[in-house]
Amino acid sequence: MSAVITPAEFNDYKVADISLAAWGRRETIIAESEMPALMGLRRKYAGDQPLKGAKILGCIHMTIQTAVLIETLVALGAEVRWSSCNIFSTQDQAAAAIAAAGIPVFAWKGETEEEYEWCIEQTILKDGQPWDANMILDDGGDLTVIIHKKYPAMLDKIHGVTEETTTGVHRLLDMLAKGELKIPAINVNDSVTKSKNDNKYGCRHSLNDAIKRGTDHLLSGKQALVIGYGDVGKGSAQSLRQEGMIVKVTEVDPICAMQACMDGFELVSPFIDGENDGTEASIDKALLGKIDLIVTTTGNVNVCDSNMLKALKKRAVVCNIGHFDNEIDTAFMRKNWAWEEVKPQVHKIHRTGPGSFDAQNDDYLILLAEGRLVNLGNATGHPSRIMDGSFANQVLAQIFLFEQKYADLAPAKKAERLTVEVLPKKLDEEVALEMVRGFGGVVTKLTKTQADYIGVTVEGPFKPHAYRY
């Protein structure tokens, strides 16, 4: 897709600068060559048009890789309207390229909170009225929640939502438990080809890149504390270790904690004996006073709280690679300490009190991306080859839900289908196979005898649902 439509012919968009479209198109073409699974699905299903009639509301980071996802959905028959799920994550050239192709998009880097909400509203609305959407593609859950709260009538026609990230899945499961979720959901985040690629290998690539772009610091020989050791934490710890940092990990889950130990990381707690009683007295000041860099990776709230921030070493770098900015207590920092912008998405946080500050003060923290996703705020996020698996999952999940036609079911059937589930393993394997082919790899086929011996078919799926990769 390379057509460029002039603003006079199409104005259902808002981006930073439409003149960046040619740049965005050049980068998109390169990204396509690095996304073999997504492009393979585009070729495989284009003739069948499995998304013909699908009207997809999308809210996911508006990057170059997302441009390839959007155009794949369109190539398979869908209509889409799009916004970004983070105020700092948009690549303006990518948004411009999508707008220039005649696809409604509302996103730019550096939105205010009010502009962010406006962009989501414009995604939902067409000509001032709710669009007759029948699918949602979300990252973090904001779009899904807004539709449930402000536009519940739209849910009568929506077949389901596909959710990209851990935080969004937590929100969906919470809504389901409370009886608030009205449409079925596919948990894309926990597909193997998403969680192992995006969450682990993607963070391994992009965290150190973002920190170095933001600070120009040498990382080797310095001490880092990674908060959380799920897939994102694992990738983050590896990212910092390969820079030569002395990496410590803190965890609440004994299994993840065990994995950190087995991977050779020192398991510590920022709290004395691991107990946080909410006071400064419970902080391990000796530990935090030596930390040069702290990164949160959990999807939880206040895992780097105000007392920890007070105890950190002077000039320590603080950042987050989880979805929302509430992993770090930025609200406390805004209320109690002075902020000095060094450059976009890099702030000195002077711990000398609110208001004015002495530029020569050396008691400050360096906060990246205002506590939001550092790899997209201070860099360009995961590379195309990583996002290939995530977005191929999104395409297959959209096809899967669209074919189920949940909105057309009888009430009794709807009650059965109202779930939050992962994509069937066979589809996960389909994504993995396309990715392997992109690397030039060759997968060995089982013989019939071998398949029978382990109780699978020659074509797969090859592992039971409970298998842990």
Swiss-Prot record:
UniProt name for this protein: Adenosylhomocysteinase
A cellular component annotation (GO) from this entry: cytosol
First-tier enzyme category under EC: hydrolase
Cofactor note: Binds 1 NAD(+) per subunit.
Major localisation: cytoplasm
Pfam family, one: AdoHcyase
Cellular localization per UniProt: Cytoplasm
Binding residue positions for NAD(+): 165-167, 199, 228-233, 251, 300, 321-323, 375
E.C. number: 3.13.2.1
Cofactors that this protein relies on: NAD(+)
Family per similarity comment: Belongs to the adenosylhomocysteinase family.
Function noted in UniProt: May play a key role in the regulation of the intracellular concentration of adenosylhomocysteine.
GO MF terms, alphabetically ordered: adenosylhomocysteinase activity
Catalysed conversion reaction: S-adenosyl-L-homocysteine + H2O = L-homocysteine + adenosine
Coiled coil (UniProt feature): none
PROSITE patterns given in the database record: ADOHCYASE_1, ADOHCYASE_2
Cysteines engaged in disulfide bonds, as pairs: none
Positions of substrate binding: T63, D139, E164, K194, D198
The protein's annotated pathway: Amino-acid biosynthesis; L-homocysteine biosynthesis; L-homocysteine from S-adenosyl-L-homocysteine: step 1/1
